[in-house]
Amino acid sequence: MDSPCPVAVGLPGHTNGTGGTSSPTCNQSMIKLAPYSPEATAAFATAITLMMLITIVGNILVIIAVLTSRSLRGPQNLFLVSLAAADILVATLIIPFSLANELMGYWYFRSVWCEIYLALDVLFCTSSIVHLCAISLDRYMSISRAVTYGPKRTPKRIKCAILVVWLISAVISFPPLLSMNKNKGGGESGALPQCQLNDERWYILYSTIGSFFAPCLIMILVYMRIYQIAKQRTRCPPGEPRKEAPANATTPQHKIQNGRGDETPGTLQKKARPPTLAVSQVESVQQAANTPIANNLLQAPSTTLTPTTPCPSPSPSNSSEVAPSKSKEGKKEKKKKKNNKNKNKKEPDNNNGESMSSDSDTEQGGRGLEVPCTPTMTPSGIHSPATMQKYRDMIATAKGAKLVARKAKQDGTPNSARRKAMVNREKRFTFVLAVVIGVFVICWFPFFFSYSLQAVCPESCALPEPLFKFFFWIGYCNSCLNPVIYTIFNKDFRRAFKKILCKNTKGTFF
């Protein structure tokens, strides 16, 4: 085998040790040392250069978008700024030297820079995944402890957390500076200088676990917990009433008050149609609506009822409908109530959408109820617009009153709309971060797994060198993917990027 040139290869007019020109043997060795053909070298260099440009430009756009867009100015997005800065450093300080080392087949630069280069490579890669781990923990705290954690999530605290992330990354990447196993080459052996990854077993296990596997496990567990919490809140959102039971179901027992102040449980069967309670023919709609009920969900807050005359107790019945009374007394009472109908207002109960406005309801157990028939009402607040709005769903009929059961309307105040928009933005942001973490794991797992095999079984588990290099460069590709993910999956970033790129650049940042 021809011996390689004793010093740096590829310099024009290079002389040998005797002062003459390079020998044909040296020139042949130079050709043999080239790892790729000229065509492959040009294609590889073009692809990696394009990747570097996308990484730098895309992550600069991310930083500008977070710092200038109102919808992205939350303190938690400072994590994305730091993550984008790490990706920019990878594209400017790591990938160019890795590309030169790959295409030339040896380390052209000084050995001191090799030490710094390897340490920075591990530092930036570790900081990326530790950033993602910190972001996932921040997501979990904001979802599980929204009330207490929200006020604590200040820009100052987030910046302190980012500083801790970089310190942890530095602790993991610092040992290579103490113990490096580099193949410097040169000297008497004539070998070319190399700058390779540390192949000491202790450091391989230390760096792979600290830089990838431990943070990856934390992120997976945290996002599993986030998914469980989100699923629970989808079924029963906090602060909202539970959904109504199906129309053919039996409602739980309700407690209604009779004229003596006793609480009597009653069970009503829901029908397929809206529930209607028949009332006595001698009672008007207004009388039926004036029955005092314990549940006052629809009752005007300023309305006061004072029962004066109890109704006669009807016979026990297991039905929710009461037979009409045909007494003369009732007819007189009916005429009297018709004359005073403008003085009274309906006050139905809205317990789970059931109408309980009959003046002669009976409990299911068979005991009759005395319900007051002539309550008096204080005039304050009865005819206010708010009170009229509450009874919009009441439909008066000749036999009584019928309530159309429907779900309570959502609060339409600006605060609730703002809160809903914030919750939706948090959901979208959580989904985008889940995609970012998933892509990161897919890109870097093959490299870290194959690298750890060198410590576990260096001889039997060794991968082919081309495959290991492929995994190595796939990991670097992750640095340019985050801006693409933000653009595809988050409309806030998409809107911010469009605003940055399409606005008039006169007098602006550019």
From Swiss-Prot:
Gene3D superfamilies xrefs: Rhodopsin 7-helix transmembrane proteins
UniProt GO MF annotations: alpha-adrenergic receptor activity; alpha2-adrenergic receptor activity; epinephrine binding
Biased composition (Basic residues): 333-344
Cystine crosslinks: 114-195
Protein biosynthesis found in the keyword field: no
Function: Alpha-2 adrenergic receptors mediate the catecholamine-induced inhibition of adenylate cyclase through the action of G proteins. The order of potency for this receptor is norepinephrine > epinephrine.
Protein name (database record): Alpha-2B adrenergic receptor
Organism: Danio rerio (Zebrafish)
